[in-house]
Amino acid sequence: LIPINTRADARADHLFQLKQPLSHTGNSTMQLSRLVLASALALAATPAFAQSAGTWTVGIGAHNVAPKSNNGTLTATPLGNLKMDVGNNARPTVTAEYFLKDNLGVEVLAALPFQHDIDVVGVGKVGSTKHLPPTVSLQYHFGQGKVRPFVGIGVNYTTFFSTKTEGPIAGTNLDLSDSWGLAGHIGVDFRISEKGALRVDYRTIDIDTKVKLNGAKLGTRNTVNIDPSVYGVAYVFSF
């Protein structure tokens, strides 16, 4: 009987030794699972660019205003039909946005005065003007991730000033009326830190102005359609 018990004990010891590696493997799997879970929680806890209800963002950047290629024709003027061409210009810009909800904000755009050359096709430069284009937009921001696109629609008011004449109309008084129009806005915020992001954006603005020379309507059709594309970059920080 003793040899039989000895063999049984030996088998029990052998089975116990086989079970130990399996137990070790189970512990390793559990530890790995805990590590993966901890990493996932840490990633989820990484702060997103703070754009939530009640917060403000301010953006400082530079934008180029590029009027559309065909700005309209002034018809039946003393100089005949004049096809207008308004030049591009880039200036520093600033935006301020207040978030009504986590994804919805109201933004105001301001800038240093833009200056544009005014050309008549076939004649050349006939003047220049400056304008300010304050724009108020309602904007929707998608998601809460590192890359956050947005869209917006708003109203633009453009005022023209410091208009000068030269060339064939030098010495005359050229007047450009102020303009109200719709504005569309799309862009993407790329998070850099909890409080900062790099923004790339594009706007299209409806700007139409009526032209007068020495106080008189210039031609039978005196509207110049500027309708620019506005694109640029900005650094946006929240508080």
Placement of each model-derived feature along the sequence:
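Short loop/turn motifs that connect adjacent beta-strands in outer-membrane beta-barrel proteins
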Residues: 50-55, 103, 143-148, 192-195
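Short, Lys/Arg-enriched N-terminal segments with co-localized hydrophobic residues
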Residues: 1-29
